[in-house]
Amino acid sequence: SIRWALLASQSIGKSTSTNLLRSDDVLNTLNCLKKLGVKIYLFKNKCEIYGTGINGYKYKKNIVLNAGNSGTLARLIMGLLVHSKNKIKIIGDKSLSKRDFLRVTKPLEKFGAKFKTNFGKLPVVIKGTKNPIPVKYKENKGSAQCKSAVMLAALNTKGKTIIKAKKSRNHSELLFKHLGIPIKIINTKKYDLIKIDGKKKIKSFNYKIPSDISSAAFFIVLTALSKNSKLNIKN
């Protein structure tokens, strides 16, 4: 859901999703995008996002984006802000503020953006560059978040960004392909080689977000631990 919202914000026109997860992390994502000038309408059965296009965010100076408890949101949105005209501060809750962010700010700095951290942690202040440059990045930790942040930065960067990433979740790659974003992926046993041509327009799109079994994991474990309990998981 977070990835859909971020990519929809980069498209041109109205994108619609159904089955959007209504969690705090996703709602914080929508709130952050609204602060960046994206129009969003949340209905009972769908969500509409009116994308601003590549490099199209419009916002006031020195805004603060609150990622709450979402490391996915905090790291991925940094990738979309490597071209930000004004300084943007990203904050989070007490738990998120204890986590390391250098592993994502370091590769994003290669695009030309500047990051100021609190000893590697939140808050993070971003000062983007008008002309981000394509990079070659090797990701050795198997972090889907770091890989995705660089992929999103590549969207706003003219030229070809090349990522050699240790095997990890491929949600971002699947969405890129679905949207027709110029991406080439070469799979090997341990690594994926990802090539992205940036600065290409993204058309608005309709998307039914797949259900995520991890959201049901808590109830599955609780049922397994409780005698005479039954759980029916649908969709």
Language model feature labels by segment:
Residues 1-235:
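Structural preference for solvent-exposed beta-strand-turn elements
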